[in-house]
């Protein structure tokens, strides 16, 4: 009976939405929403907090600041989530194809049993995941709603470029990640114009 009650409570929390987690000025209002995708043009992006920290499933510490200057793809998931299982291979495939281009992936596992989460990630994802049972780490990202699954693409300046509200697939995710990764690095010097002086 106790297990049944725990399962019901966990499922209720899992399917719920964390509301009011971001700032009062919702960054998404400045962006374009089409279906389940929010796209923010570079001049419309809002920086997220850079002190996002948590403990990974293997027990080691993670700090978002360690990925500064990279494009970071953040996926919110749970082992209890059927759409999360469906998108897992597509996320891993995208990660493998983009990590050499300065792209990092991070999973946020919420409302989950830790052993079940480890079993889910094993063989599915080679990138790290934070264990976030109570959703506190998810709240550190400036989003007013965190449903599961959901994927954020954060640019090299620490701003949300895309939010995919729901499951994603390789053919959708890869072009988005590539587009953000191709943007000029914030510390890159301006390209010098080739002089045409003295040319005939």
Language-model-detected regions and their locations in the chain:
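Conserved hydrophobic packing residues within short motifs/helices of P-loop NTPase cores
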Residues: 74, 106-108, 152
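Residue-level recognition of short loop/turn positions
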Residues: 58-60, 157
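Short loop/turn microsegments at loop-to-beta-strand junctions
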Residues: 49-50, 72, 148-149
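Short active-site neighborhood of thiol/selenol oxidoreductases, capturing the structured segment around
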Residues: 62-85, 91
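Thiol/disulfide oxidoreductase modules built on the thioredoxin-like
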Residues: 119-126, 132-200
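Structural microenvironment flanking redox-active thiols in thiol-disulfide oxidoreductases
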Residues: 85-124, 133-140
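N-terminal targeting signals for export/organelle localization
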Residues: 1-53, 183-200
């Amino acid at each position: 009976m106790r297990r049944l009650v725990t399962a019901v409570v966990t499922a209720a929390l899992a399917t719920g939405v964390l509301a009011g987690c971001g700032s009062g000025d919702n960054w998404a209002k400045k962006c374009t929403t089409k279906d389940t995708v929010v796209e923010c043009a570079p001049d419309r992006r809002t920086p997220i907090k850079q002190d996002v920290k948590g403990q990974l499933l293997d027990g080691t510490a993670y700090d978002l600041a360690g990925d500064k200057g990279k494009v970071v793809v953040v996926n919110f998931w749970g082992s209890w989530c059927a759409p999360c299982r469906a998108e897992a291979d597509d996320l891993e495939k995208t990660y493998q194809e983009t990590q050499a281009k300065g792209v990092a992936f991070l999973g946020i596992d919420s409302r989950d049993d830790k052993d079940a989460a480890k079993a889910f990630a094993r063989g599915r994802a080679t990138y790290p995941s934070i264990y976030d049972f109570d959703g506190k780490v998810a709240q550190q990202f400036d989003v007013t709603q965190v449903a599961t699954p959901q994927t954020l693409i954060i640019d090299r300046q620490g701003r949300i470029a895309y939010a995919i509200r729901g499951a994603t697939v390789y053919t959708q995710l890869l072009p988005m990640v590539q587009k953000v990764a191709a943007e000029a690095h914030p510390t890159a010097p301006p390209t010098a114009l080739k002089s045409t002086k003295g040319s005939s």
